């Protein structure tokens, strides 16, 4: 079971559990066809989640795992799972013998300055997931490093020698990860939260000022997005994304038609203003879809 709009990777089962790319993968990759083993529910819909487990049980279907991102990075950038929804997911997986895996690869430290979802504000005291994955910010964006954290219960299922890859347990990767964690001070964590709030406030004000081009602003910490009116093309040739990159802003698209932002952890208020002004410039002076 995964969430509508969720994204978990491009290979193997994580790709199969990725709702946001499932249709595209099926269209182009034969190995993804004929698989009807994924249940999806809308994020933060507690009733739908409970109903999915009840219906599966009634049909004698075993839900082996829930995959979900604490903050979405691809399908609906910046959309956060609520503590209530997480708590119910944890409750149901424990009751049904399923695994709860939190995919924090994109969110990680970027969302609140905390590594694990159970350290996010509002999640303190909730039981940990069975597994949680980290990467991206943990490797400073420079070195191949990903981490799988497990509870003691999940670790008992792990078999040494069965899982691995060429880069596993790489000493240099470990040094990079430790160095990054050492640089994430209390001041950096506070900046992640404060600048995240500032970005949202200023982008929401811009959306109101422009009255139309930006249809939604959402985010958690320094993972946030602006959804654009269909008159604007978020990505591809002749897009808003391309225009902003050519004007010095490293933005990337996400969702159906959104601009996704992941600024560095020590971003300043002056840089916030610069980025917001660049968004305004792109909306006012950048490309639009040809009128039909």
Task: Kindly label every feature range from the protein language model.
Residues 196-201, 210-243, 265-268:
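Conserved PLP-binding catalytic core of the aspartate aminotransferase-like
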Residues 69-82, 97-123:
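Conserved PLP phosphate-binding loop immediately N-terminal to the Schiff-base lysine helix
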Residues 10-17, 77-79, 110-115, 143-150, ...:
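Short acidic, glycine/serine/threonine-rich loops at helix termini
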Residues 153, 172-191, 266-270:
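Amphipathic alpha-helix from the class-I
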Residues 10-14, 122-157, 169-174:
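Active-site PLP attachment segment
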Residues 186, 263-292:
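PLP-dependent enzyme catalytic core of the Aspartate aminotransferase-like
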Residues 92-96, 210, 247:
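Helix C-cap/helix->beta junction micro-motif
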Residues 1-65, 84:
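PLP-dependent aspartate aminotransferase-fold enzymes
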């Amino acid at each position: 079971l995964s969430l509508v709009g969720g994204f978990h990777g491009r290979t193997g089962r994580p790709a199969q559990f990725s709702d946001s790319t499932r249709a595209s993968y099926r269209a182009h990759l034969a190995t993804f066809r004929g698989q009807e083993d994924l249940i999806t529910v809308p994020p933060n819909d507690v009733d739908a989640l409970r109903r999915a487990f009840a219906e599966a049980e009634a049909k004698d279907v075993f839900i082996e795992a829930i995959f979900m991102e604490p903050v979405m990075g691809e399908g609906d950038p910046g959309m956060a799972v609520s503590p209530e929804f997480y708590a119910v997911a944890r409750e149901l997986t424990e009751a049904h013998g399923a695994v709860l895996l939190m995919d924090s690869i994109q969110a990680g430290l970027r969302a609140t300055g905390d590594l694990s979802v159970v350290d996010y504000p509002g999640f303190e005291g909730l039981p940990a997931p069975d597994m949680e994955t980290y990467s991206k910010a943990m490797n400073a964006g420079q070195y191949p490093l990903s981490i799988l954290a497990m509870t003691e219960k999940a670790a008992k299922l792990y078999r040494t020698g069965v899982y691995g890859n060429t880069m596993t347990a790489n000493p240099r990767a470990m040094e990079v990860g430790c160095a990054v964690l050492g640089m994430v001070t209390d001041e950096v964590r506070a900046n992640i939260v404060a600048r995240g709030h500032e970005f949202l406030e200023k982008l929401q004000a811009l959306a109101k000022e422009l009255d139309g081009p930006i249809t939604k602003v959402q985010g958690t910490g320094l993972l946030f997005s602006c959804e654009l009116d269909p008159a604007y093309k978020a990505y591809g040739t002749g897009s808003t994304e391309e225009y902003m990159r050519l004007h010095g802003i490293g933005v990337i698209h996400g969702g159906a038609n959104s601009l996704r932002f992941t600024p560095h952890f020590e971003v300043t208020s002056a840089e916030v203003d610069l980025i917001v002004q660049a968004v305004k410039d792109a909306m006012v002076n950048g490309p639009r879809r040809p009128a039909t």
